[in-house]
Amino acid sequence: MAIKRGVRLQCNESKSINYITTKNAKNNPDRLSLNKFCPKCRKVTTHVEIKKK
């Protein structure tokens, strides 16, 4: 069975956490990086996976 875990995506510019998604940790061990819309910046920016506190 695939190991799926929840990850949080943080905007690189405003540092706000805007999205929560899941990823397969076995197939994608690297950090997730996606271009998404940031409501605080009001534009499309790069969002990266952050560690849980």
Swiss-Prot record:
A single cellular component GO annotation: ribosome
Xref: Pfam families: Ribosomal_L33 (PF00471)
Underlying gene: rpmG
A single GO molecular function term of this UniProt record: structural constituent of ribosome
GO biological process: translation
Family per record: Belongs to the bacterial ribosomal protein bL33 family.
Gene3D superfamilies: Ribosomal protein L33
HAMAP family: Ribosomal_bL33
InterPro entries named in the record: Ribosomal_bL33, Ribosomal_bL33_CS, Ribosomal_bL33_sf, Ribosomal_zn-bd
Keyword terms: Ribonucleoprotein, Ribosomal protein
The protein's name in its UniProt record: Large ribosomal subunit protein bL33
